A protein has these predicted regions:
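Low-complexity, intrinsically disordered Gly/Pro/Thr-rich segments
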Residues: 135-137, 145-154
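Basic, often amphipathic N-terminal segments
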Residues: 1-65, 87-143, 160-169
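Residue-level signal for tight coil/turn positions that link beta-strands
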Residues: 8-10, 75-77, 146
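Short histidine-centered catalytic/ligand-binding loop motif
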Residues: 79-86
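Pocket-edge structural micro-motifs
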Residues: 41, 83, 153
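Short proline/glycine- and acidic-rich turn/helix-capping motifs at secondary-structure junctions
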Residues: 69-77, 111-116, 149-159
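Short, conserved acidic/polar surface loops in the N-terminal third of protein domains
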Residues: 77-78, 93
Length: 169
């Protein structure tokens, strides 16, 4: 499995990490906040062609803004997330990848079910609804910049960034 991820700027990553460190004790299985939005998850067997195709789609792409507008609980996957608006360059980039590779993307990123987000907490056994209430009170909408697109291979434990594209300003 290979993910195409939009990496947000350091200030936005710190803002989301600080939100997680609200003084509450989370019994969470979430590791350190990496600060990204998954655009697509490729499950095919031609990774090199997929990366080359995505690089081609990115050739005219510049840094762009995303607006984080809300905190949401996604119960089907036991995660609490910060969600950017599904619009603009973020949506256009997702749709371009999905149009070209729809048959080789997972069910969550290949079509209109795609829900852009940055995971804040993962805990299938915890009280995420209580955590959601706390984080919603402390959250204020903000704008982040996407400065880099990375290709991340999911491993047994963790992930490996196998390639990236730095977006020009």
């Amino acid at each position: 499995m290979l993910c195409v991820i939009a990496r947000i700027d350091p200030g936005a990553r710190e803002r989301l990490a600080a939100l997680r460190r609200t003084g509450e004790t989370w019994d969470s299985r979430t590791g350190e906040l990496y600060g990204h939005i998954t655009l697509a998850t490729y499950v095919g067997d031609a990774e090199d062609r997929f990366i080359a195709s995505c690089r081609e789609l990115l050739s005219g792409c510049r840094t762009f803004s995303v607006r984080y507008g809300r905190i949401e609980l996604l119960p089907a996957t036991s995660i609490l997330v910060a969600s950017p608006d599904k619009e603009g360059a973020l949506l256009a980039l997702h749709d371009a990848i999905a149009e070209k590779w729809s048959g080789a993307l997972d069910r969550w990123t290949g079509d209109e079910r795609w829900k852009p987000h940055t995971t804040l907490l993962y805990d299938p056994d915890g009280d995420l609804a209580a955590a959601e209430a706390v984080l919603r009170k402390k959250f204020s909408p903000f704008t982040a910049r996407v400065e880099r697109i990375e290709f991340s291979r999911v491993e047994e434990t963790g992930y490996t960034i196998v390639d990236h594209v730095d977006l020009p300003a």
